[in-house]
Structures are given as structure tokens and as C-alpha cells.
């Protein structure tokens, strides 16, 4: 079982590397890692489990965050309508996105970042992601709102990008052009 001890923190060079594509069909080792990742995210949202194992609640995790430089992400998040998006994916890729942008009014956080980084993180309002599910099926997801933001955050990790790289350095709370805030 993964715990916070397995989550590497900012400053570790793995977080700045571009992760490798996962060879498909996925090996047993990669499948096990991805299963552990989605279990970690789900467990972190369960108050009892989070307390028992000292887990910081999270809604997404990318393999580089546990020291595995491979293109794998786990997301477990509910949108504004209460729809659950729970996905464990290999080789996710954003294949299209809206022109319109959004940002979380409270900013973003990250399990690999132990400090608060104030500022708006510009994200696309809508994205389409293509990936391979943990069961080996090709999936295409059309996402908007919080799920779209979470997927962009996790896919950034696969490209060595941290959320705070997107924050305007001169004016952290400048609303990005063509954007509307998303409240969480």
C-alpha cells in the first residue's frame, strides 16, 4: 500500500523529467503500480484511512510523484454535478482543448508540494484526453470543470511541469485572458 512516504517532494529531479511511455500491453509491474496509485487516491479521501495512515487527501496522482518516471495517472474526483470521475490510465494525452480558460479561485495544491503556492493556475476549460485504461482498453474522455483541471495537472507531471510553473510571476492573481474562475 502506498503512503505519503512514497510520494516524492519538489526538488527531486524525477519531477522535472519527461516520463517514458508505458509499453502496451502493460506489464504486471506497471499494472500493479497503477492499481496502487488509484487505491492511494481513493484511500486519501477516506477520513478513517487518511487518519490511520497519515495520508494527505488528494484527487490525483502521477507516477513520477512516486518516483516512477512512466506515463501513468490516477484520478478520483467528483464534478459540480456529483458525477464521479475515477480513472487509472496509461499514456494519457490531451488531444484537443478549448480556447476558453479557467482557474481555481483558491489556487492549486499538490501532494509533492508541502508549501502553499498562492496564485491562479490557468487551465483549459474543456479538454479531450485519449489514454489506455488499466484494463487495456483505449478510452477517450471529454472533460470540463474540476475533472479537466485535475487531468491537466496530472498530465503536466508526466512532462516535468509543476502547477506553479503556470502562475504569472509578476502578478500571481492576474486572471488569465479568456478565462472564467471555477469555484471549488
UniProtKB/Swiss-Prot annotation:
EC assignment: 3.5.1.88
Listed cofactors: Fe(2+)
Pfam families in UniProt: Pep_deformylase
Name this polypeptide is given: Peptide deformylase 2
HAMAP family in alphabetical order: Pep_deformylase
Keywords carried by this UniProt record: Hydrolase, Iron, Metal-binding, Protein biosynthesis
The gene coding this protein: def2
Catalytic residues as annotated in Swiss-Prot or TrEMBL: 154
Catalysed reactions listed for this entry: N-terminal N-formyl-L-methionyl-[peptide] + H2O = N-terminal L-methionyl-[peptide] + formate
DNA-binding among keywords: no
SUPFAM superfamilies: Peptide deformylase
Residues that hold Fe cation according to the record: 110, 153, 157
Gene3D superfamilies according to UniProt: Peptide deformylase
Amino acid at each position: 500500500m502506498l503512503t505519503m512516504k512514497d510520494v516524492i517532494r519538489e526538488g527531486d529531479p524525477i519531477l522535472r523529467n519527461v516520463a517514458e511511455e508505458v509499453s502496451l500491453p502493460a506489464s504486471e509491474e506497471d499494472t500493479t503500480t497503477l492499481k496502487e496509485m488509484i487505491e492511494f487516491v481513493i484511500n486519501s479521501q477516506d477520513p478513517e484511512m487518511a487518519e490511520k495512515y497519515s495520508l494527505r487527501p488528494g484527487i490525483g496522482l502521477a507516477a513520477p510523484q512516486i518516483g516512477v518516471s512512466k506515463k501513468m495517472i490516477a484520478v478520483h474526483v467528483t464534478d459540480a454535478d456529483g458525477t464521479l470521475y475515477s480513472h487509472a490510465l496509461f499514456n494519457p494525452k490531451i488531444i484537443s482543448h478549448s480556447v476558453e480558460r479557467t482557474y481555481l479561485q483558491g489556487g492549486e495544491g499538490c501532494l509533492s508540494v508541502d508549501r502553499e503556492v498562492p496564485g491562479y493556475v490557468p487551465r483549459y476549460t474543456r479538454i479531450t484526453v485519449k489514454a489506455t485504461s488499466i484494463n487495456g482498453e483505449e478510452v477517450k474522455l471529454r472533460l470540463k470543470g474540476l475533472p479537466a483541471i485535475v487531468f491537466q495537472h496530472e498530465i503536466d507531471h508526466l512532462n516535468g511541469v509543476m502547477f506553479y510553473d503556470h502562475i504569472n510571476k509578476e502578478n500571481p492573481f492576474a486572471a488569465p485572458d479568456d478565462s472564467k474562475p471555477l469555484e471549488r
